Swiss-Prot record:
One of its GO terms (molecular function) is 5S rRNA binding. Residues 184-209 have a biased composition (Low complexity). Residues 183-209 are annotated as: Disordered. Disulfide bonds: none annotated. This is one of the proteins that binds to the 5S RNA in the ribosome where it forms part of the central protuberance. The keyword rRNA-binding applies. Part of the 50S ribosomal subunit; part of the 5S rRNA/L5/L18/L25 subcomplex. Contacts the 5S rRNA. Binds to the 5S rRNA independently of L5 and L18. Pfam families: Ribosomal_L25p, Ribosomal_TL5_C. The keyword Ribosomal protein applies. It comes from Pelotomaculum thermopropionicum (strain DSM 13744 / JCM 10971 / SI). GO terms for cellular component: cytosolic large ribosomal subunit. This is Large ribosomal subunit protein bL25.
């Protein structure tokens, strides 16, 4: 599903202008690509936040850019966002204009589901790769790759080559790179046996009467 976002072209880049944008709920942003060059814009922070929360950071966005009384429409991806370090509010965004006919690179999160059989045997489930670099059409970027770990026993590993990728999606990572594994848990060290004839360990001292 393609999200929609309106943008306003801007020429001013002063701090006071940026402050006035944020007072209106807008943030400065930049969109770049072969059909737009590098264009400074402003977008509604709340609308962008809704897209990020609902469709994820890899969402394909149909952007309507208002400039000099005209509207230009472009397909874009969110390249980077900046947030206030304290309040975590959006303060800036970069967008990359893409063609629906071209393949793009995207970093997709890996989600684990199920309870590994090996953990019942005392093993430890260890995620090793939480995000995977992939290549596909801009309209086919998966929101996440879900991996079922239910069948993993101690010593088992799921690699990049084992990931259930949708048709048309190709992983760019090393196929042998481990994604998740189950290792044997550490056993508590056994107490050394007392030597034959050794005196028992002294107990707490008793006060003399």
């Amino acid at each position: 599903m393609t999200a929609e976002l309106e943008a306003q072209a801007r020429t001013e880049k002063t701090r006071s202008f940026t402050h006035s944008l944020r007072e209106k709920g807008m943030i400065p942003a930049v969109v770049y690509g072969k059909n737009v060059g590098s264009l400074s814009i402003a977008v509604d922070a709340g609308e962008l936040q809704k897209i990020l929360e609902g469709a994820g950071s890899n969402a394909l966005i149909r952007m309507k850019i208002k400039e000099n009384g005209k509207i230009r429409k472009h397909n874009v991806l969110v390249k980077e966002v900046q947030r206030d370090p304290v309040r975590r509010e959006l303060i800036h965004a970069d967008f990359h204009q893409v063609s629906l006919k071209d393949r793009v690179h995207a970093t997709v999160p890996v989600h684990l589901t199920g309870s590994a059989a090996g953990t019942v045997e005392g093993g430890v489930l260890t995620p090793l790769l939480r995000r995977v670099e992939m290549e596909c059409l801009a309209s086919e970027i998966p929101e996440a790759i879900t991996v079922d770990v239910s069948g993993l026993r101690i010593g088992d590993t799921i690699t990049v080559a084992d990931l259930p990728l949708p048709p048309g999606v190709r992983a760019l990572e090393d196929p042998e790179a481990p994604v998740v594994t189950v290792t044997a848990g550490e056993r508590p060290a056994a107490e050394p046996a007392a030597a034959p004839g050794a005196a028992p360990a002294a107990g707490p001292e008793e006060a003399e009467e």
